[in-house]
Structure formats: C-alpha cells, structure tokens
Amino acid sequence: KVLENGGTIGGSSAGATIQGSFLARGDTKNNQVMMGDHQDGFGFLKNVAIDQHVLARNRHFDMFEILRNRPELLGIGIDESTAIIVKGDIFEVVGKSYVVVYDGKFWSREGSELKKLPEKEQIFYFLREGDRYNLKERTIMN
C-alpha cells in the first residue's frame, strides 16, 4: 500500500535483500546459505535476487548459486555504504562503493558494446555512483 500511495520504502543489509522477489541468504540456521529454507522476498523488485556486503565480505561470486538454479532472476549485489534508488523500472546507484549486476552480459565504460556471454560464464560487472540501470530491459542507461 505504501508504494501504491506514492510512499517510499527502504532497507539496509537484510532489509535490502528482502525487497527482491527471491530472498538470498534466507536460511534460518546460517546466513552463508544462498538458497535457504525461506526463499520468498517481499517482491517489490520482481524477478530479482539481492545480496548485500558483496565486496566488503568477498561475496561477489555467491550469487551464482542462485542464478544456476533460477536463471530467470536478475542478481544485484549491493556493497556497504552503497544503495540503489528505484523509481519505476530504473535504479540509480548512490554511495561510496559499488553495485554488482549479474545479468549474463559484459559491459565496460571503455566503449564496449553490451555482449551476451554463454550461460556457463560467471560474469558480473560493477556500477558506481550515478550509474543507472533499467530493470525491465536489463540494460545500463547512459
């Protein structure tokens, strides 16, 4: 109801993770388990799995466990002191560190075109403050 009425929601750490439709690290016994006994997030971001503290805790490869089992999901890893602000289908990165995007594509600031890689590749890329991403199209916005 809050979002439907134009309100704002937020969350950090596990509070950010639960905003996606898939709950990463939702195990009641151990937060190192990526696909635990609780897998349903709030679904504010549809077909998305969100992880947190990804660089500070060296977790940037953990998302692949989920994506191997649920390849339709978009993986988003948010590092400490960093956030995404979502408006409609677009998110923008704010903060000191990076957001890691797992969409099966390669992207570079140095002018590379977006390229689809074989599904077996464990590929991700980083977005920094000010970068924007279209959740619906699964593309970076320039």
State where each predicted segment sits.
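Short amphipathic alpha-helical segments and helix-helix/interface helices
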Residues: 1-3, 63-64
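Catalytic nucleophile loop
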Residues: 2-22
